[in-house]
């Protein structure tokens, strides 16, 4: 029965329709896999077994009576950032202690309406602030991947580390995730899974705990490109409850898979060749270029001159927005309250006890750059630089480029409690150097597994597209997937 | 620009986060590392460049001005640490 958990969503869809097994059997297989693995991987922070069985039974009814929906009976994991009615929703923070929303996020509402089954809530960096899933109040997630012959625990990346680890370790068929600076694509690259951050405005942000509102976007992490397309189709919608939700119909992303890339122009930005990047990543990038060329795409060198300023601009814009969004955690309306002598001390004590170190650091930076006298020098300047970053991309696309190919991350997965990363916050931030530009410009980006390094750890490539042209990303990522093959961790857990 | 420990304490007060001497001193180092990193933005010529307000050009949507929601006092206070009859309870704020 354990093999059921190895099926992709497209396989599940076909086999459930053929009555090879029931949705309940599939859900039970996942629940038992979680029970065995979770103590070691810590991917789930809460498992909703009863709810999962109930939803699976309802799917079986549908499958029996006809009228199966697009994700009928597909067991999914949900990042703890998504509000799920009556179920643990804490953004993996202590400050949202015991919070159980009375409402459901739009993205998860869409998934349940399409017949998906909720297995539970997934671990993540606290408030999605981190690149290693080590800032979670619930402890780090362990990457199912290990070095060849080694037994050192590695990080799964972050902030959607639980989502990526659960998908890679066969603990859910697919997962929801969110990406503010690389939080879908970097963990996907670290775990040999596929992750897409769609265009800003494609998925509703309603009911997703806010980190940096002008950058946050939801997207799926999946086992392959097709599954990512199937999931995004369900997650995306036009939502009157989110004013930044864009009024464009959601296309059938799956239909783009398998389409030829002949004649497509793929841009290779020279600024992504950064100092200190491992030779293996450079080599993998070249392989990706060859694969695209072999498939008939035209390769063109491009320049995105403001690339190096994206990360510093991000570390002004994102903390500024976070400091404002996180002002709501005051010990009054929900979550943790720590008493004080007066109301101000109650606020200060609650926030000191409730927020972790990385979250406090970002609130402090954000408060500082927005404070009187510094706003122009920091925040306004960063937003002007952001305009320039976006303009770089616009010029490339205007010149006829259809998609841009880059490495997904500057390294493979690193060890948990890495001393260098812990000693220097900026070092950790550099993980997002290739992904953050995409958030700053609001564009879609997909990370697709492309190979293993000499230690046997996964590496990914990223494709960046025009706004609302996710279809070209699925089309091109599929070429890489077919050329590179799929990668699975050895089960040690 | 760099910050000293007194600035860090002032910012912590603005952010309503209690810090002790040790926290403030650690944060001073961390904040200065980050502020040092973002300093490179000063190299960029931003003359005449409009600050970004929205990544996707869009006009704010309008909706009909009608009541579509409400009467959920129970739901709204359900997660509060202390409530009484649909009110949030806070420490006394006026003498």
From Swiss-Prot, chain A:
GO CC terms in record: glutamyl-tRNA(Gln) amidotransferase complex
Catalytic reaction equation(s): L-glutamyl-tRNA(Gln) + L-glutamine + ATP + H2O = L-glutaminyl-tRNA(Gln) + L-glutamate + ADP + phosphate + H(+)
UniProt-listed PROSITE patterns: AMIDASES
GO biological process, any: translation
Catalytic activity, EC: 6.3.5.7
Domain of life (superkingdom): Bacteria
Gene Ontology molecular functions: ATP binding; glutaminyl-tRNA synthase (glutamine-hydrolyzing) activity
Tagged with keyword Transferase: no
Pfam families: Amidase
Active site per database record: 79, 159, 183
Alphabetically ordered keywords of this record: ATP-binding, Ligase, Nucleotide-binding, Protein biosynthesis
Subunit annotation: Heterotrimer of A, B and C subunits.
Family under the similarity heading: Belongs to the amidase family. GatA subfamily.
NCBIfam families: gatA
Entry function: Allows the formation of correctly charged Gln-tRNA(Gln) through the transamidation of misacylated Glu-tRNA(Gln) in organisms which lack glutaminyl-tRNA synthetase. The reaction takes place in the presence of glutamine and ATP through an activated gamma-phospho-Glu-tRNA(Gln).
Stated name of the protein: Glutamyl-tRNA(Gln) amidotransferase subunit A
Originating organism: Chelativorans sp. (strain BNC1)
Name of encoding gene: gatA
UniProtKB/Swiss-Prot annotation, chain B:
Assigned EC number: 6.3.5.-
Name of the protein in question: Aspartyl/glutamyl-tRNA(Asn/Gln) amidotransferase subunit C
Keyword field contains Ion transport: no
InterPro entries in alphabetical order: Asp/Glu-ADT_sf_sub_c, GatC
HAMAP family in alphabetical order: GatC
Catalytic activities: L-glutamyl-tRNA(Gln) + L-glutamine + ATP + H2O = L-glutaminyl-tRNA(Gln) + L-glutamate + ADP + phosphate + H(+); L-aspartyl-tRNA(Asn) + L-glutamine + ATP + H2O = L-asparaginyl-tRNA(Asn) + L-glutamate + ADP + phosphate + 2 H(+)
Gene3D superfamilies for this protein: Glu-tRNAGln amidotransferase C subunit, N-terminal domain
The family this protein is said to belong to: Belongs to the GatC family.
Organism: Chelativorans sp. (strain BNC1)
Subunit-level organization: Heterotrimer of A, B and C subunits.
Keywords attached to this entry: ATP-binding, Ligase, Nucleotide-binding, Protein biosynthesis
GO MF term list: asparaginyl-tRNA synthase (glutamine-hydrolyzing) activity; ATP binding; glutaminyl-tRNA synthase (glutamine-hydrolyzing) activity
């Amino acid at each position: 029965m354990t093999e059921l958990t190895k099926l992709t969503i497209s396989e599940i869809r076909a086999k459930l329709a053929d009555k090879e097994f029931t949705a309940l059997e599939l859900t039970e297989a996942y629940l038992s896999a979680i029970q065995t693995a979770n103590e070691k991987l810590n991917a789930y922070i809460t498992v909703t077994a009863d709810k999962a069985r109930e939803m699976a039974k309802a799917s079986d009814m549908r499958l029996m009576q006809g009228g199966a929906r697009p994700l009928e009976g597909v067991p999914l994991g949900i990042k703890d950032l998504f509000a799920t009615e009556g179920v643990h929703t804490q953004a993996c923070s202590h400050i949202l202690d015991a919070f159980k929303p009375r409402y459901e996020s739009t993205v998860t509402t869409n998934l349940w309406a399409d017949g998906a089954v909720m297995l539970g809530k997934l671990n993540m960096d606290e408030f999605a602030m981190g690149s290693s899933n080590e800032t979670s109040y619930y402890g780090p997630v362990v990457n199912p991947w290990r070095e060849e012959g080694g037994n050192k625990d590695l990080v799964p990346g972050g902030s959607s580390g639980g989502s990526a680890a659960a998908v890679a370790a066969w603990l859910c068929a697919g997962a929801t995730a969110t990406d503010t600076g690389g939080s879908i694509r970097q963990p996907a690259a670290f775990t040999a899974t596929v992750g897409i951050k769609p265009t800003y405005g494609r998925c509703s942000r309603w009911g997703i705990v806010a980190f940096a509102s002008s950058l946050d976007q939801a997207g799926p992490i999946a086992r392959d490109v097709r599954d990512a397309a199937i999931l995004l189709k369900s997650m995306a919608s036009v939502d009157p409850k989110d004013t930044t939700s864009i009024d464009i119909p959601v296309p059938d992303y799956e239909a783009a898979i398998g389409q030829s890339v002949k004649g497509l122009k793929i841009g290779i930005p020279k600024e992504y060749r950064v100092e200190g990047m491992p030779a293996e990543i450079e080599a993998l990038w070249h392989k990706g270029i060859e694969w695209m060329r072999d498939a008939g795409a035209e390769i063109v060198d491009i320049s995105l001159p403001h690339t190096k300023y994206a990360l510093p601009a991000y570390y002004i814009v994102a903390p500024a927005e976070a400091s404002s969004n996180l002002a709501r955690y005051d010990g009054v309306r929900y979550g943790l309250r720590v008493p004080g002598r007066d109301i101000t001390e109650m606020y200060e004590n609650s926030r000191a006890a409730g927020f972790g170190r990385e979250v406090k650091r970002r609130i402090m930076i954000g408060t500082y750059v927005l404070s009187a006298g510094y706003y122009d020098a920091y925040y306004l300047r960063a937003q002007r630089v952001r305009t320039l970053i976006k303009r770089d991309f616009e010029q490339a696309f205007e010149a006829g480029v259809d998609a841009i190919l880059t490495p997904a991350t500057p390294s493979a997965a690193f060890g948990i409690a890495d001393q260098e990363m812990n000693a220097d916050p900026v070092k950790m931030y550099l993980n997002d150097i290739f992904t953050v530009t995409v958030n700053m410009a609001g564009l879609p980006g997909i990370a697709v597994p492309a190979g293993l390094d000499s230690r046997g750890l996964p590496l990914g490539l990223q494709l960046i597209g025009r706004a609302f042209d996710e279809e070209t990303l699925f089309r091109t990522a599929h070429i890489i997937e077919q050329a590179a093959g799929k990668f699975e961790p050895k089960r040690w857990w | 620009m760099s910050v000293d420990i007194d600035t860090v304490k002032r910012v912590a007060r603005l952010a309503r986060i209690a810090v002790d001497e040790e926290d403030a001193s650690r944060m001073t180092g961390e904040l200065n590392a980050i502020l040092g990193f973002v300093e490179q933005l000063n190299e960029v010529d931003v003359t005449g460049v409009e600050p970004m307000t929205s990544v996707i050009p869009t006009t704010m949507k309008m909706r009909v001005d009608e009541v579509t929601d409400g009467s959920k006092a129970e739901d709204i206070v359900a997660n509060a640490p202390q409530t009484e009859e649909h009110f949030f309870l806070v420490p006394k704020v006026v003498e």
